[in-house]
C-alpha cells in the first residue's frame, strides 16, 4: 500500500504535467523572447551582403515581433514536452522508481519528437516567417492569425510543416540533452542535501541554466540548418533539402557558421533552462499544496 502511494506521488498525472509544463513555458518565453528574436534575426540576415543588412531596431515593440505566436506555441509545446517525458519516464523506470541515464535520453528523444509534431514545427514556422516578413519594405503579415492565413493561402499545409525533419531532429536532440543533463545534475545535487529535502529555488535555477548551456552547443548546428533551409520565406528557392543546405553552409561559409546565433541563443537557453525547470518544480509544489492527495489534479 505504501509502495502504491509512493508510486502515485512520484508519477504526476497527465493533467498535472500539462498544467506545470504549460505554465513554465509561458513564463519562460515571455521573459526571454528578445534573445530569441536576436538569434533568429542574426541567422536570417547572415545571407545578406553588408550593404543590405538591416540595422538592429531600438529595443521595443519590434523586438517582440512574433511574441504572441511563440508564447502560445511555447506554452503548448512545454505542456506536451513535460507530459510526454513524464509518461515515457514512468514506462522506462525500474520497480524502485529509478531511471538510468540512457533511458532518460530515450524519454527525452520521445518527448522532443512528440512536441515537434504537435507544436514546435507549425508554431516556429509561423514565428520565423513573421520575423522574416518584417525584413521587407512592405510587410504583408499583420500578426499570428493573418500570417497563418497568408502562409496557408500561398503554401498550403506544407507551409506549416516544411522543415519537420530538421526541426524534429533538433527538438529531439534538444529535449534529450536538456532532460538528461538536468536529471543527472539534479541527482548529483540531491546527494548533498538531507534525505527527503528538496533543492532550493536557486539550486534548481542554476541546474536548469547549466543544462541549457549544454543544450546550446550540442544542438546549435541543427538549429542553424532548420532556420536557414526550412523556414525562411526564400528557403524553397535556395535549397532542395536540409542535407543540401548543410553542405552549402559548410562549403560556402565554413564549419563555424553552424554555430551562428549561438550567443543570443546561449543567453536565452541558460535563462530559459533555469526558468522552465524552476517554474515546473514550483508549480508542482503549488499543485501539491492545492491537492496534496492528488485526487483531482
Curated annotation (Swiss-Prot):
Keywords: Membrane, Mitochondrion, Mitochondrion inner membrane, Repeat, Translocase, Transmembrane, Transmembrane helix, Transport. GO terms for biological process: mitochondrial citrate transmembrane transport. It is a multi-pass membrane protein. Gene3D superfamilies: Mitochondrial carrier domain. Solcar repeats lie at residues 12-91, 102-188, 199-286. The keyword Iron does not apply. GO terms for cellular component: mitochondrial inner membrane. GO terms for molecular function: citrate secondary active transmembrane transporter activity. It catalyses: citrate(in) + H(+)(in) = citrate(out) + H(+)(out). It is found in: Mitochondrion inner membrane. Disulfide bonds: none annotated. Belongs to the mitochondrial carrier (TC 2.A.29) family. This is Mitochondrial citrate transporter A. It comes from Aspergillus niger (strain ATCC 1015 / CBS 113.46 / FGSC A1144 / LSHB Ac4 / NCTC 3858a / NRRL 328 / USDA 3528.7).
